[in-house]
Amino acid sequence: FYALYPEKFNNKTNGITFRRWLEFSNQALAAYIKELIGDEYLHDATKLQKLLAFKDDKKVHQQLAKIKFENKLALKAYLKENKGIELDENSIIDTQIKRFHEYKRQQMNALYVIHKYLEIKAGKLPKRKITVIFGGKAAPAYVIAQDIIHLILCLSELINNDPEVNKYLN
């Protein structure tokens, strides 16, 4: 049918462009990028290549680190207020937020968490604390996705209740 009516076929995604996401989800970073290279990147992603001019600029790196840290503080405040969860803003934050599905690799990330847990138990401690955040949902009838969620919840309980490990991994 495409050969007959190519204009009737166009790709749709259930996502959002990274530029729109950046503009609304990380306003401080978006504002800084605009300060550095202007706002053309919002309509033409190739304009982001202009950022390469700043790759060795220590002042730019410092400002990016400041924005990142302020975002961590905002996440910390949100999690405390809305979920009662304490976040160490100096930890490495590893997030995976998407619908649970076998092909979306949440179980691979869970295996990584198990690996880190076993390393810590064996005495190999990370240089910085690691905070892992999973988010998502799964259809009630999708058994494997529900099993992945169950695995992650069990890992969370195991790690958070192990004082030897939870100093380094949450």
Residue ranges and their predicted role:
Residues 1-170:
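Catalytic cores of carbohydrate-active enzymes across secretory and cytosolic contexts
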